[in-house]
């Protein structure tokens, strides 16, 4: 039943590249077969509950611009928000959604009331999922907005805050499991510091390791079969975040023996903040065996902070999905639109239009990536570039069968005098542009 929030807008349909209808897909066709799989099953789109239905439109210089009828901290408002959200998922045809606990339930006076409120809304969500067919990609806990977390959650100097946060995560894992969520995400929003003058760096990292081990232990205890994901971010809101980027998180997981238990949810905007390209973070996560899922958005390249805009750059999407596909595609992860409207985009239709544009952009990127893989447009030049390593002698070198003395003798007796070869970067950049 319609809530009336979206007026007379009908379910978004595919109309083809020539369509000028802003409420239609031009490239995203859920049932189109790409590399032997439905496009919907490749992309596994999800809507972010927080930016789409909870963000009030404020910025550092001004307050709320969005006037939503559910902007009250009551259970009645939470259920109205859920009604609108699931109507939105159905109109858009999004197979998944994601949420923080604080996005979906009113704030209680204590932990017990928060848990009661969360359980009530989870029961409501279960009914909505059953009636719409929309599924939960992942759940998570908001351990950064409330003032109790101003000095961190797992890394807080107060053990009571650590305990409150750990108990909150338990309830959120329970909620995620009950709703059939395929992943559970940990984002260390305030797991970092502003100054070393009041920070015991080693202690905080050890606390974070203990916290993550507790989560993994609980996952196995209750038989939760989803994937635990960490989302890296270099700064914001703290100056120095402990989960800076893929490489940093991998080192942390390795130190605590969790590299086979936890994978990463990689956000495009966070990669940019860390000084990396999106495809760098995806390729590195694949190389390290910890790729899990994507938060899809983009940052303004001039602003220098996290702007969470909808993706609109097809070449960037093509390279991103190239690495997703090259790594075997999503397993339990997907493409979550961690994107928000600009604060002047007030119309309900703008929510749909932003997601439609993002989904079309991703669809174009996916199809370009698939063609590049099928044509070996990048993989063959890569194989040719490293072909020398396929020789018998080079394989022995790679496997560690030669000592430094033996390698030196080989170079001398064979009079090895290598000459550089072109890296062909311009050619490969032109190849990518041919596909997009």
Swiss-Prot record:
Catalyzed chemical reaction(s): alpha-D-xylose = alpha-D-xylulofuranose
Keyword Plastid on entry: no
GO biological processes: D-xylose metabolic process
Binding site for Mg(2+) 1: 231, 267, 295, 338
Assigned keywords, A-Z: Carbohydrate metabolism, Cytoplasm, Isomerase, Magnesium, Metal-binding, Xylose metabolism
Location of the active site: 100, 103
A GO cellular-component term linked to this record: cytoplasm
Location(s) in or outside the cell: Cytoplasm
Required co-factors: Mg(2+)
InterPro entries tied to this protein: Xyl_isomerase-like_sf, Xylose_isom_bac, Xylose_isomerase
Entry coiled-coil feature ranges: none
Top-rank EC class of the record's enzyme: isomerase
Gene3D superfamilies: Divalent-metal-dependent TIM barrel enzymes
Co-factor remark: Binds 2 magnesium ions per subunit.
Enzyme Commission number, as recorded: 5.3.1.5
Any one GO MF annotation of this record: xylose isomerase activity
Residues binding Mg(2+) 2, per UniProt: 267, 270, 306, 308
Primary localisation category: cytoplasm
Domain of life (superkingdom): Bacteria
Assembly and binders: Homotetramer.
NCBIfam families documented for this protein: PRK05474.1 (NF003998), xylose_isom_A (TIGR02630)
PANTHER family documented for this protein: PTHR48408, XYLOSE ISOMERASE
Family: Belongs to the xylose isomerase family.
Record protein name field: Xylose isomerase
Taxonomy of the source species: Bacteria, Pseudomonadati, Pseudomonadota, Alphaproteobacteria, Hyphomicrobiales
């Amino acid at each position: 039943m319609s809530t009336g929030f979206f007026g007379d807008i009908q379910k978004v349909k595919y109309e083809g590249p020539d369509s000028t209808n802003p409420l239609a897909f031009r490239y995203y066709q859920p049932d189109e077969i790409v590399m032997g799989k439905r496009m919907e099953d490749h992309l596994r789109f999800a809507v972010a509950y927080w930016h789409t239905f909870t963000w009030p439109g404020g910025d550092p210089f001004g307050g709320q611009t969005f006037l939503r009828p559910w902007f009250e901290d009551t259970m009645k408002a939470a259920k109205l928000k859920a009604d609108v959200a699931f109507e939105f998922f159905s109109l858009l045809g999004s197979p998944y959604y994601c949420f923080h606990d604080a996005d979906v339930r009113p704030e209680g006076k204590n932990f017990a009331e928060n848990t009661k409120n969360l359980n009530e809304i989870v029961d409501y969500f279960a009914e909505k999922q059953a009636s719409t067919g929309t599924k939960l990609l992942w759940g998570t806990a908001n351990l950064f907005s409330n003032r109790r977390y101003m000095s961190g959650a797992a890394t807080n100097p107060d053990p009571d805050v650590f305990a409150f946060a750990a108990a909150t995560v338990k309830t959120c894992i329970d909620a995620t499991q009950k709703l059939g969520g395929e992943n559970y995400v940990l984002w260390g929003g305030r797991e970092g510091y502003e100054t070393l003058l009041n920070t015991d760096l080693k202690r905080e990292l050890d606390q974070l390791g203990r916290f993550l081990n507790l989560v993994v232990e609980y996952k196995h205890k209750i038989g939760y079969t989803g994937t635990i994901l960490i989302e890296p971010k270099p700064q914001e809101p703290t100056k120095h975040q402990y989960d800076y980027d893929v490489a940093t998180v991998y080192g942390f997981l390795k130190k605590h023996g969790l590299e086979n238990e936890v994978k990463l949810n990689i956000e495009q905007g966070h990669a940019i903040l860390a000084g990396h390209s999106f495809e760098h973070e995806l390729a590195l996560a694949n190389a390290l065996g910890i790729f899990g899922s994507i938060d899809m958005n983009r940052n303004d390249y001039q602003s220098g902070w996290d702007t969470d805009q909808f993706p609109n750059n097809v070449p960037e999407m093509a390279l991103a999905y190239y690495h997703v596909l090259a790594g075997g595609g999503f397993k339990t992860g997907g493409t979550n639109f961690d994107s928000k409207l600009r604060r002047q985009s007030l119309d309900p239709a703008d929510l749909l239009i932003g997601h439609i544009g993002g989904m079309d952009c991703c669809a174009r990127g996916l199809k370009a990536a698939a063609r590049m893989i099928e044509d070996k447009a990048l993989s063959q030049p890569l194989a040719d570039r490293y072909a020398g390593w396929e020789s018998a002698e080079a394989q022995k070198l790679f496997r560690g069968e030669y000592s430094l003395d033996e390698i030196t003798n080989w170079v001398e007796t064979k009079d090895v005098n290598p000459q550089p070869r072109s890296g062909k970067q311009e050619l490969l950049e032109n190849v990518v542009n041919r596909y997009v």
